[in-house]
């Protein structure tokens, strides 16, 4: 896994990848470390800067930077060979590959984290972990989760071996820290990842790398001790793996520093051994997010460098987990990238996580802001249902910080959406045309503009639930029957045509129904409708209502940002005419008769529009848009093909023609069979 990830990373050469590589290297090394020989420890120390844990999955390039030759090839191998204990000291040595020369190379990636010597290690660790998580690279990300689990499983094994390698006190210290720290799970994960890789390969690479590293790094007498220490820490706990990931920092770890936890060893000079990769638990994104925060880096296996950054590591890890893998969220598939322990302990619950894609959905977010408009405007299914779906996806979209706010806004609007959307979706009942629904409540849209007319008070009650209008509805049976939400429209219509049911009703229905469709409108309908119902004046009231209705619709449109009426018109051509003509007339103050006639004649409720087309057949005389494709029509009506071939033959041919995209196929031509 590490190898695969590392290769893509190597190509990219991104810091993330490098960090990932380091993390993987460090993890793997610990796995092998228990078996590492004293000489191997020395080599490892020599390589200390470039050491990477076997378990960590990251581009080998990152760790390798210290030793581009050895690290690039060996790193992948190491990644591939995750055997925790099998890797020989050579592997440890490879892990410790002297990164001083490569450090410069690595610096681009680790420099950030390495800047602080003390905190650098934890930070690098975090980076490694982050990369391991796959924050930086999707490839690493995906494999990482599995690796963490594996590491977790094998961690106990590593821990058991660790005690024997305890020869180095510092190493011993490191193991305790891992035990204490939450990062242990990370180390375990790393170990698992390491185990996943074949031990032999890992060992071979490590040995070759270790030897090379030993030669390169040789010159630090305490290297052997350091190596042992690293080995002990690694074996003791998956945590050591992180420790092992010594740093790639240019400065070699002095033996003294090596004595300290591996992280310390990697870094007094390495700046905390930016390479210090904690278990793959920390995602690159996470590390970056936490930035210089060494604790985040410390998150790794709980190694505590002499600086005692590790203790922070525990906290940072918890914090990161709490944040839901900030890095992860920030990165791309944050949740998946988070190591298994992190994922289990702290799912990135705030937002659903899509392993492959960014959680943010720009198309989803805007609805939040405009949700009302869209909902009201598109209450009809297209927008409403999708909106709800968006709600489902809402959590994942958007970055973690916004997720709280987003969630609430989404939540609020969405919750209303189901109730409001369902009713308003197709609230315009055909009955409204001829039959003025007497429900007194004015249309919701009318209600908002109610301010101009005396019924303005009802406008204030818009909060009233849409259900309220239903009770007031008098003879809006058609509307009521049409739909539960219909009551709202019914009220609107009744309000429009309380006195002139037939004349005003159509107009009201046309103008108000669209308005009613919006959830807001529906909500407003109850109080407004009731208020208007109370004062149903014959003509004056009618006019007022009529004016109100169109005005209300306009007002709603303005308020919603999407006109309840306007959007409806575009959505449904028939509605546009009725709304536009009737509603426009009403609002303009066109004679009630004119408005009513228009509305009555052509008020097509949005839901009705689909079925209301006068074209009842797909015959040849129909215009082109209504005609069926030649092949379909031929299939449906075959005057000459009655029984020449079994029906299934025609079906097969038709299916074939459709699949092939043929515009026409001859039913008779190929019936030879």
Curated annotation (Swiss-Prot):
It comes from the Eukaryota. The keyword Protein biosynthesis does not apply. Residues 70-83, 257-268, 413-424, 504-531 have a biased composition (Low complexity). Residues 192-202 have a biased composition (Polar residues). Residues 542-551 have a biased composition (Basic residues). Disulfide bonds: none annotated. InterPro entries: GGN. Residues 125-506 are annotated as: Interaction with GGNBP1. Residues 161-178, 438-475 have a biased composition (Pro residues). Keywords: Cytoplasm, Cytoplasmic vesicle, Developmental protein, Differentiation, Nucleus, Phosphoprotein, Spermatogenesis. Residues 511-673 are annotated as: Interactions with ZNF403/GGNBP2 and OAZ3. One of its GO terms (molecular function) is ubiquitin protein ligase binding. Testis-specific. Specifically expressed in the germ cells and not in the somatic, Sertoli, or Leydig cells. In adult testis, expression starts in stage VIII pachytene spermatocytes, increases in stage IX and X pachytene spermatocytes, and culminates in stage XI diplotene spermatocytes and the meiotic cells in stage XII. Expression decreases slightly in step 1-3 spermatids, further decreases in step 4-11 spermatids, and is no longer detectable in step 12 spermatids and beyond. Isoform 2 is mainly expressed in testis. The modification Phosphoserine is found at residue 399. GO terms for biological process: cell differentiation; double-strand break repair; embryo implantation; gamete generation; protein localization; protein-containing complex assembly; spermatogenesis. Residues 14-30 have a biased composition (Basic and acidic residues). Pfam families: GGN (PF15685). GO terms for cellular component: cytoplasm; cytoplasmic vesicle; membrane; nuclear envelope; nucleolus; perinuclear region of cytoplasm. Residues 1-599 are annotated as: Disordered. Isoform 1 and isoform 3 interact with FANCL. Isoform 1 interacts with GGNBP1, ZNF403/GGNBP2 and OAZ3. Isoform 2 interacts with GGNBP1. May be involved in spermatogenesis. This is Gametogenetin. It comes from Mus musculus.
């Amino acid at each position: 896994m590490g190898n695969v990830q590392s290769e893509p990373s190597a190509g990219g050469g991104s810091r993330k990848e490098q960090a990932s590589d380091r993390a993987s290297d460090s993890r793997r090394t610990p796995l092998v470390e228990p078996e590492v020989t004293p000489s191997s420890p020395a080599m490892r120390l020599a390589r200390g800067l470039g050491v990477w844990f076997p378990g960590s999955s990251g581009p080998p390039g990152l760790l390798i930077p210290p030793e581009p030759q050895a690290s690039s090839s060996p790193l992948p191998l190491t990644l591939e060979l995750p055997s925790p204990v099998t890797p020989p000291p050579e592997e440890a040595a490879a892990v410790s590959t002297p990164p001083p020369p490569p450090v410069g190379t690595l610096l681009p990636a680790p420099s950030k984290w390495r800047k602080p010597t003390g905190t650098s290690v934890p930070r690098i660790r975090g980076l490694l972990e982050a990369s391991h998580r796959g924050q930086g690279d999707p490839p690493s990300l995906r494999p990482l989760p599995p690796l963490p689990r594996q590491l977790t499983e094998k961690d106990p094994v590593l821990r058991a071996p660790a005690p024997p390698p305890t020869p180095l006190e510092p190493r011993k210290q490191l193991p305790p820290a891992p035990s204490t720290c939450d990062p242990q799970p990370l180390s375990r994960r790393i170990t698992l990842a390491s185990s996943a890789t074949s031990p032999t390969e890992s060992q071979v690479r490590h040995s070759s790398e270790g030897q090379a590293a030993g030669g390169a790094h040789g010159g630090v007498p305490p290297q052997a001790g350091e190596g042992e220490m690293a080995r002990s820490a690694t074996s003791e706990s998956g945590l050591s793996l992180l420790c092992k990931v010594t740093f790639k920092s240019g400065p070699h770890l002095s033996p003294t520093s090596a004595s300290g936890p591996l992280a310390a060893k990697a870094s007094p000079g390495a700046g905390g051994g930016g390479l210090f990769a904690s278990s793959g638990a920390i995602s690159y994104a996470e590390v970056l997010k936490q930035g210089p925060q060494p604790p985040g880096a410390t998150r790794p296996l709980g190694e505590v460098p002499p600086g005692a950054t590790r203790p922070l590591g525990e906290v940072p890890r918890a914090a990161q987990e709490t944040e839901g893998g900030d890095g992860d969220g920030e990165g791309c598939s944050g949740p998946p990238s988070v190591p298994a322990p992190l994922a289990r302990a702290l799912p990135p619950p705030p937002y659903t996580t899509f392993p492959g894609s960014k959680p943010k959905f720009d198309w989803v977010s805007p609805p939040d802001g405009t949700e009302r408009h869209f909902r009201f405007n598109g209450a009809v299914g297209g927008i409403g249902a999708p909106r709800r779906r968006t709600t489902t996806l809402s959590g994942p979209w958007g970055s973690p910080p916004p997720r709280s706010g987003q969630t609430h806004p989404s939540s609020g609007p969405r919750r209303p959406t189901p109730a409001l959307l369902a009713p308003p979706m197709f609230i315009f009942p055909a009955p409204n045309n001829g039959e003025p629904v007497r429900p007194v409540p004015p249309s919701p849209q009318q209600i908002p503009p109610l301010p101009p007319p005396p019924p303005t008070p009802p406008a204030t009650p818009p909060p009233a639930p849409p259900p309220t209008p239903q009770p007031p509805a008098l003879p809006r049976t058609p509307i009521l029957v049409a739909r539960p939400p219909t009551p709202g429209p019914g009220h609107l219509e009744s309000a429009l045509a309380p006195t002139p049911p037939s004349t005003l009703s159509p107009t009201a229905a046309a103008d108000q129904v669209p308005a009613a469709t919006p959830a807001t409108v529906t909500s407003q309908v109850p109080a407004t409708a009731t208020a208007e119902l109370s004062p149903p004046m014959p003509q004056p009231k009618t006019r007022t209502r009529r004016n109100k209705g169109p005005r209300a619709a306009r007002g709603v449109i303005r308020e919603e940002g999407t006109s309840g009426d306007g959007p409806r018109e575009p959505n449904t051509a028939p509605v546009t005419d009725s709304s536009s003509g009737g509603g426009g007339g009403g609002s303009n103050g066109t004679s009630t008769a004119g408005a009513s006639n228009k509305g009555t004649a052509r008020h097509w409720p949005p839901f009705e529009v689909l079925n209301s087309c006068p074209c009842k057949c797909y015959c040849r005389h129909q215009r082109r848009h209504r005609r069926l494709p030649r092949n379909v029509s031929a299939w449906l009506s075959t005057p000459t093909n009655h029984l020449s071939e079994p029906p299934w033959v025609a079906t097969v041919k038709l299916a074939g023609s459709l699949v092939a995209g043929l515009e026409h196929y001859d039913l008779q031509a190929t019936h030879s069979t």
